[in-house]
Amino acid sequence: MTDSAAPRLHVQALSADWAEAARHWAERLGLPLAADDQADFAVQVGEQGLQVLQLGPDSPGPVRVDFVEGASAHRRKFGGGSGQMIAKAVGIQPGVRPRVLDATAGLGRDGFVLASLGCEVTLVERQPLIAALLEDGLERARRDPDVAPIAARMRLLGGNAADLMRAWEGEAPQVVYLDPMFPHRDKSALVKKEMRLFRPLVGDDLDAPALLEAALALASHRVVVKRPRKAPVIDGAKPGYSLDGKSSRYDIYPKKALNKA
């Protein structure tokens, strides 16, 4: 697969029990169900839900959304609660749990953290396959008694976030959260298998300035942009202040103070 060629994908049932579900996802995503020797990725359906596997000898393993076990469960239990930097960035404080629009949801990890801390979170993902992984993960989370109350605070929308924000109807989110993909090649991030999936399927968010502009127009209280720590700010309005971590930075664009309800 070259950088300029669109990746080839096919849908695969991991056993006969999942053949009907595989047909469903193939139709939903507009992907072939038959095996393709030239495919770069397999969209697999099985007991653990929907997952994407990069094919080839150097495959990093399947990628799925799992809010019940693994990294998300560990962070929910031991991640530092409202003392986490992301919590401070969106304005979580005693008596304040803002309504958040996560406009670049990806695999939903940050959105889940915010929902686990009590925020109502709307997630937007523009890439249909990534949105499908997130939809499947949320559906499984809603069936788990421990995680269901958190998943109930998460709502998923598919589509272009900038367009959705410009056409927003109803009560505006208090906070818009952006974590765009950028062309900066951070080697420590690229080794993660999620990045191996995202680069060819999603590409970089070259419309980040337009996303920021739409977010600033919609958010009632603040916009938060997550960036690699040493990366430049997004072109456009300048942040009011930043919170720096070891590898990431949160640029905060305040509009008005978040107060107790």
UniProtKB/Swiss-Prot annotation:
Localization per Swiss-Prot or TrEMBL: Cytoplasm
Binding site for S-adenosyl-L-methionine: 109-110, 125-126, 179
GO annotations of cellular component type: cytoplasm
Record's catalysed reaction(s): guanosine(1516) in 16S rRNA + S-adenosyl-L-methionine = N(2)-methylguanosine(1516) in 16S rRNA + S-adenosyl-L-homocysteine + H(+)
Alphabetized UniProt keyword annotations: Cytoplasm, Methyltransferase, rRNA processing, S-adenosyl-L-methionine, Transferase
Keyword Transferase recorded: yes
Disulfide topology: none
Source organism, top-level taxon: Bacteria
A Pfam family this chain is assigned to: SAM_MT
GO molecular function: rRNA (guanine-N2-)-methyltransferase activity
Listed EC numbers: 2.1.1.242
Keyword S-adenosyl-L-methionine: yes
Function: Specifically methylates the guanosine in position 1516 of 16S rRNA.
Entry's family note: Belongs to the methyltransferase superfamily. RsmJ family.
Protein name: Ribosomal RNA small subunit methyltransferase J
Species of provenance: Pseudomonas paraeruginosa (strain DSM 24068 / PA7)
Gene: rsmJ
